[in-house]
Amino acid sequence: MKVIKTLSIINFFIFVTFNIKNESKYSNTFINNAYNMSIRRSMANEGSNTNSVGANAPNADTIASGSQRSTNSASTSTTNNGESQTTTPTAADTIASGSQRSTNSASTSTTNNGESQTTTPTAADTPTATESISPSPPITTTESSKFWQCTNKTDGKGEESEKQNELNESTEEGPKAPQEPQTAENENPAAPENKGTGQHGHMHGSRNNHPQNTSDSQKECTDGNKENCGAATSLLSNSSNIASINKFVVLISATLVLSFAIFI
């Protein structure tokens, strides 16, 4: 009888040590896998940040806005007869956004008779949705006055449209302000209903927390880590099952030891 008691006691200690070793193994593997997964996620986030910075780098070749100045000078040529011929360049500068200044210098030519001829270059500036300043020499006053009148009209229309947009935004934002306290008042009566049933709120929180784990596992699967796809959930389930089995075995062994010690 003493031999049976000693064997049962030895068996009890063997079960206890075996269970402790198994739990330590599974806990260590679970911690290591979680640590590796966190490192991989941090590396993936760093890679995405570097890619976004590289994509947002500005190109030196393309300029969206700025100022451009073009100077065009006329060329003169003289012949043996004393006649001079002048060639005048034409400037056609287009800018997407910004300010443009084009200065054209007039050319003079003299003949043997003492007569001077001056020629002025022509500028054809076509800015698109920009403010253009072209101080070219005044050829005719009517064209310049018409041009400034057109620009003033367009500026007036732009200011009127901006004022209308501001008025529309103010009218749209006005009635929205009093709606917020109504929603707050509507949400306040629902609070005491959840206080009455504590279990309902607990179940609701568990339901909300459950899909987050599934989303993490799905992200890992989509990233291409097939080895660790769903590793966290499987380890949790395995560790919980093994812990429950170990506790059951320990309880059985303890009852056996006590029964042998008391009744025998």
Swiss-Prot record:
Residues 1-20 form the signal peptide. Residues 60-123 are annotated as: 2 X 32 AA perfects repeats. Sequence repeats lie at residues 60-91, 92-123. The N-terminal region appears to be involved in lipid binding. It is a lipid-anchor; GPI-anchor. Residues 44-190 are annotated as: Polymorphic region. Coiled coil: none annotated. May play a role in the merozoite attachment to the erythrocyte. Disulfide bonds join C221-C229. Glycans are attached at N22, N36, N213, N238. GO terms for biological process: cell adhesion. A lipid is attached at N238 (GPI-anchor amidated asparagine). It comes from the Eukaryota. This is Merozoite surface protein 2. The keyword Transmembrane helix does not apply. Residues 70-81, 102-145 have a biased composition (Low complexity). One of its GO terms (cellular component) is side of membrane. It is found in: Cell membrane. Residues 46-227 are annotated as: Disordered. InterPro entries: MSA2. The lineage of its organism: Eukaryota, Sar, Alveolata, Apicomplexa, Aconoidasida. It comes from Plasmodium falciparum (isolate FC27 / Papua New Guinea). Residues 82-101 have a biased composition (Polar residues).
